[in-house]
């Protein structure tokens, strides 16, 4: 429905636009050109001006005076001569032909009319030449030379000057003048004396440098260096990081179950009757961390492990360490967590608190600080 209504509106608007366009064209043709300014039919009356006796109006402007020129007189004379010629010959001219056209066509008609005689043409030419000469003597081209000058203005009578004969002079050659020199020998201008420039030699400076080098006392310098106090290298105190795996109350770790777990973790029974973890998994190399009995005296009886029982074990590592301290700490922490999982125990820190993520970060920062101090000590 909306589409049909839209189409109807479009058709109606197109019809209205075309009707307006056709009406505009029709009105333009009817009026021919409405944009042209219409000239008024009534002519404007010229303004009349009153002139006084001297010929000036109220604005002080005089009347226009037209002076006939010599050219107009010349044209009139030529026109009259041409018309008389055509009348004598019996040639009729049209009324609308102007005299100027007669003058322009004079030569053409003279050639066409073969009846005219040469004598009459010569008379016409002579008359036209005389008229031209007379026109040249007009007031505009004349100069009044009739006035004569008096003797007072001209002065005494002029006597003709005697003719001067031109005398041709012979060209004279200039004589060479010989001037004797005042001095027997030519004088040469003395050159200005140059100021002596003292050149500074570079050899003395080199000598002084060498002399200074020779005079250096190396024995004194060696004695000064020996007298300077030697810096004592600061030795860092070793630190120990301890982790403990403790059983709950009224529970113990049995030696028969503990021994295979320790061997699985790569620990080997060794010095001080405790278990150690070496750099190599086969038990070779330096010790990285160790495991001891939490109960006094802290050792294990390997021959009597089946009858052995304890409340827990302690894992510890020393700083500086034979291996990477960060990786060694990760191995020791993983071993403690694995033992705690097998025996349902808890992992405690060196203050016998439960191990948390914050405690782990504290241990790592402690290892990082010790590593920084050790590097500084090595540089010094």
From Swiss-Prot:
The gene is zipA. It is found in: Cell inner membrane. Belongs to the ZipA family. Interacts with FtsZ via their C-terminal domains. SMART domains: ZipA_C (SM00771). Its main location: membrane. It is a single-pass type I membrane protein. HAMAP family: ZipA (MF_00509). Keywords: Cell cycle, Cell division, Cell inner membrane, Cell membrane, Membrane, Transmembrane, Transmembrane helix. One of its GO terms (cellular component) is cell division site. This is Cell division protein ZipA. InterPro entries: Cell_div_ZipA (IPR011919), ZipA_FtsZ-bd_C (IPR007449), ZipA_FtsZ-bd_C_sf (IPR036765). It comes from Colwellia psychrerythraea (strain 34H / ATCC BAA-681) (Vibrio psychroerythus). SUPFAM superfamilies: Cell-division protein ZipA, C-terminal domain. It comes from the Bacteria. The keyword Transmembrane helix applies. The chain crosses the membrane at residues 8-28. Residues 1-7 are periplasmic. It holds the Pfam family ZipA_C. Essential cell division protein that stabilizes the FtsZ protofilaments by cross-linking them and that serves as a cytoplasmic membrane anchor for the Z ring. Also required for the recruitment to the septal ring of downstream cell division proteins. Residues 29-380 are cytoplasmic. PANTHER family: CELL DIVISION PROTEIN ZIPA. GO terms for biological process: division septum assembly; FtsZ-dependent cytokinesis.
């Amino acid at each position: 429905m909306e589409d049909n209504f839209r189409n109807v509106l479009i058709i109606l608007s197109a019809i209205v636009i075309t009707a307006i366009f056709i009406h505009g064209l029709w009105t333009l043709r009817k009026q021919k050109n409405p944009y042209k300014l219409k000239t008024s039919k009534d002519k404007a009356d010229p303004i009349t001006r009153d002139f006084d006796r001297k010929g000036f109006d109220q604005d002080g402007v005089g009347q226009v005076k037209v002076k006939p020129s010599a050219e107009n007189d010349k044209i009139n004379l030529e026109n009259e001569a041409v018309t008389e010629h055509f009348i004598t010959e019996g040639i009729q001219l049209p009324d609308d032909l102007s005299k100027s056209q007669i003058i322009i066509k004079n030569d053409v008609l003279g050639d066409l009319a073969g009846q005219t005689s040469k004598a009459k043409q010569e008379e016409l030419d002579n008359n036209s030449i005389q008229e031209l000469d007379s026109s040249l003597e007009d007031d505009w081209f004349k100069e009044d030379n009739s006035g004569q000058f008096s003797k007072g203005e001209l002065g005494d009578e002029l006597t003709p000057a005697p003719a001067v004969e031109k005398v041709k002079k012979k060209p004279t050659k200039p004589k060479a003048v010989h001037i004797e020199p005042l001095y027997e020998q030519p004088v040469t201008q003395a050159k200005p004396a140059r100021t002596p420039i003292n050149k500074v030699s570079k050899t003395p400076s080199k000598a002084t440098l060498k002399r200074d080098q020779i005079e250096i006392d190396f024995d004194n310098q060696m004695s000064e260096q020996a007298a300077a106090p030697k810096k004592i290298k600061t030795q860092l105190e070793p630190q120990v990081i301890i982790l403990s795996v403790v059983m709950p109350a009224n529970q113990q770790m049995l030696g028969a179950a503990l021994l295979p777990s320790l061997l699985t973790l790569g620990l080997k029974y060794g010095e001080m009757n405790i278990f150690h973890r070496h750099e190599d998994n086969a038990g070779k190399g330096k010790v990285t961390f160790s495991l001891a009995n939490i109960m006094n005296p802290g050792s294990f009886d390997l021959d009597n492990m089946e009858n052995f029982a304890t409340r827990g074990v302690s894992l510890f590592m020393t700083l500086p360490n034979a291996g990477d301290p960060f990786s060694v700490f990760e191995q020791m922490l993983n071993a403690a967590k694995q033992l705690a999982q097998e025996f349902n125990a808890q992992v405690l820190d060196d203050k016998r608190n439960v191990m948390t993520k914050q405690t782990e970060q504290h241990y790592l920062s402690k290892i990082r600080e010790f590593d920084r101090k050790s590097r500084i000590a090595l540089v010094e």
